[in-house]
Amino acid sequence: MKKIALLLCAIVMFGCSDDEEKAGTEVPDPEISKMLFSEFCKSDGIGVSDVTKEEEFRYEDAWLTGYTYTQEVSIADLTEIISHPLTIQYGNNRSSVTFTDEIGTERKYTLNEEGYATQCEYASLDQKRQYTFSYTDGYLTQVNEKIMPREGSSDAVVAHTLSLQYDKGDLISTISPSLPYESSTGYGKLQTNYEAGEDINYYRLPCMLVADTYPLSFHREAFFAGMLGKPRQHLTTASYPEKTSDTYTERTEYTYSFDKNKKPVSLKVSTKYGNGKSISYLNRTISITIE
């Protein structure tokens, strides 16, 4: 079984070309006990609360064993902490794993010999979904979703597909489905292109934007657990939609900061929007702790 590995080895510089390096990098499987992502969101108006968001992933023997999403909400002198833990239970021989949240929503994954999910049964209080995952050379290339009609309903099954494309182990594009509420916008399927930098992804971090792309957003924890295929070879430095126009442009840049051992300690996400007349920016800073 291929286990997740998210910590660093010492970097050894070889006399090879950039093309040779991008063709494949062997990354050892160091131990990890925790990954923590923290982001402070400052309010932009009176009566709106500041929020600190944290995601904590916990591991034992390189397997994900716990996950908690926490929000610390602050209004004036009042602070409230809201925690959303996830229970993780593996089946015999780790051939399956079930994620259960605090309200009883379950996601049961079937794992192959490499530890990658091949299918998932999602069940909430009022909805069931089915997912299948496809891989090419170990990389996740397709996620298929079926939303089952509610019991007693005459509605048809709703299907969505997310496709991912790679070049030399680096993600170069995703094609995501148009959701029902988007159908009137004329967008159809949405293609997003990605640019890889020179920093090798030693810690095997997923791209944040990809993790939030529907329907992969339903499997964020599995993505960070290494259950959805090989990690990209290099850290992503930029993403942008394939379709833009003279009246709309968008580009997001990802800038990582590292410690002396090349361990990522923060990620700055900067998105630039243009409407043909002016440019606006949305900036985020995410702190990263890896133990």
Language-model-detected regions and their locations in the chain:
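Positively charged n-region of N-terminal signal peptides that target proteins for export
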Residues: M1-I4
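Sec-dependent N-terminal signal peptides
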Residues: L7-L8
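Buried hydrophobic residues that stabilize the cores of well-folded domains
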Residues: D19-E291
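C-terminal motif of bacterial Sec signal peptides marking the signal peptidase cleavage site
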Residues: V12-G15
